[in-house]
Amino acid sequence: MKSPLSGQWSVIGGRFGLRLLLLVGVLWGSFNGPVALNAQQNKPWEKIPVPKLHDFKPQEPKRIELKNGIVIFLQEDHELPFVSGGVLIPGGSRDEDPAKAGLVGLYGQAWRTSGTAKMDGDQLDDLLESKAAHIETAGDDDSTAVAWDSLKGDADQVFALALDLLLHPKFNPEKLQLAQQQEAAGIVRRNDEESGIADRESAKLVYGANSPYTRQPELASIGSVTVEDLKAWHDRTIGGKLIIGITGDFDPVAMEAKLREAFESLPQAKPEPPRHDSFVGPKPGLSFINKDDVNQSNVQIMGLGIDRRNPDVPTLAVMNEILGGGFASRLFQKVRTELGLAYEVGGGFSFAYDHPGVFRVIALTKSASTVEATKAAMAEIAGLNSRPFTQEELDRAKDNILTSFLFRYDTREKVLAERERLEFYGYPPNYLETYKAALEKVTVADLTAVAKKYVHPDKLAVLVVGNGPEIKPGLDELNLGTPHSIDITIPMPKGSGGPAGAMEKMQ
C-alpha cells in the first residue's frame, strides 16, 4: 500500500530537501556544537582499556625422529576432509656448482614433469586432475621439496605417488629441455622491470657478486646442465636428512606407521660440513643502473644485517616497525605523507635463519624527485640515532607486531610449516614463544641501544635504478662520491648470436 505521506515527502525531497537538511544541520550545530566539541576534545573512547592479548599457544604438532635421522611432524586437523604433506630436503642453489648455476631450479621443474618409471609426468597430471589432487616439486636456495594434497579418501593413493616420485624419479631429457627453455626465457627478460633489477643487484652489493646467495643462472650455465646432473643431485640429497610434515584429517597412529614403513629403510644421513660463507657488507657509496625506458626510480639503501639467533632480533623488529613498517612509520609519514616524495617507502632489517640478512630501505619515486626522496629516506635512517624514540611509537609498534604475529600462525598448517623450518635450521622448538615474550619486554632504552649498535649510515650503500638522462646529473647532490655504473648486460653463450640463437640451441 502506498503511504499517504509519500507524495509530500517526494516534494520535500525534490524541491526543499537540500534547504531542509541545511536548516536541520544549522539547528543541530547550534544546540549541540559545544557538546560535540567537548566530546572531541575529551575523546573518552581513548580511555577504554585495551585487553591484553591471550597467551600465544599454537597447536603443537607431534614430533617423531626415526633411527636414520629423518624427522616427522604430524599435525591433526579434522575440520575438513583433506590431507596435505611435504618433504623438506636440505641442499639448494647455494650448494650447486657455480659453473652450473640454475641446476636446482631446473631440477625442481623437471623432477615433477618427468614423473617416475611407473608413471610419466603427463600420466601423473591426468590422474591427479581426475582426483582434484596435487603433487609439486620445487628448489630453493637452501632446500628442495616435494609437496602434495588431496581429499581424505584419496590420501593413501596420492601419498604413494608422491613417495614414488621422491624415491624413484625418472628424469626425462625432453622435460629438462622444456625447463631450460622456460628458465632461458626468464633470463632474457630479467632486466624488463626496474624493481627486479634493483632487488637483484642490491643483494649483490651487500653479499658480493660471487656469493652463493646472489649467484644467478646464465644462459650458458643452464645450457650445460644434463640429465646426469639432475640424477647426481638427487642421489646426493635424498637420504636420512629429510623433514616430513603431514597435516589434515588423518588417524595419527596409522599415519605414523605408514611413514615409518616408507622412510625407516633409507640410509643414515651423512653429516654436512659446516658452511664458511664470508659476509663483509657493502662498500659505502652510490651505484647507478640506467633504465631509460622508465620515468621513475627505484632507490635502495642497504647494509648487512644479522641472523635470527642474535638476541637483538626482537628489539630490531620493533625498530623496523617504527622506521618503515607501515602507514604510521617514520619513513611513510615523512617521505610520503608530509613531503610527497614517494609512491611507496619502507624497510628495515631482515633476519635470515643461518646467515646475516640485509638492512634495506626502498623508495619508489618519480625521476624528478629521486634525489630529494633519497635524501629524505637517508635522513630518517640517520634519525634513528638522533631522534629519540617515544613510548607511543614503542607501544604502537609492539601492538602491530604482536597482532600480526598471531595471524602468521593462526592455522595449524602455518604452525607446522614454521616448526619444520625451525627443525631444518636447528632452532629450539619453543623459539616462537620465547620470541614473542622478548618482543613484549622491549623498552625505549633497548631501541636506543640497538640503533646505536647496528645503524651506521656511513657504512650503507645506495643503489638507484632509473632513467639516466633524467636523474643522473642531479645525483652529485647526494654527496656520495662519483656514481658507480653497474653493467647488467646479459652474457650470451659463445656462438649463439644473441638471445634468439641461445634459445634456439635449447630446442
Model-derived regions: residue spans:
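Residues that act as N-cap/strand-start positions at coil-to-secondary-structure junctions
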Residues: 56-58, 129, 283, 446-447
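Active/ligand-binding-proximal structured segments within catalytic/core domains
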Residues: 69, 78-128, 295, 301, ...
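Charge-rich, well-structured scaffold segments of protease-associated domains
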Residues: 40-44, 65, 123-271, 315, ...
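Mature N-terminal segment immediately following signal peptide/propeptide cleavage
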Residues: 49-86
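Short, basic, low-complexity termini and linkers enriched in Ser/Thr/Gly/Pro
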Residues: 3-20, 24-39
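His/Glu-based metal-binding/catalytic segments typifying zinc-dependent metallopeptidases
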Residues: 77, 88, 271-330, 358, ...
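Short, surface-exposed beta-strand/loop micro-motifs that present aromatic residues
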Residues: 61-63, 71-76, 231-235, 284-291, ...
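Short, basic/low-complexity N-terminal boundary segments at the transition from targeting/disordered tails
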Residues: 21, 38-52
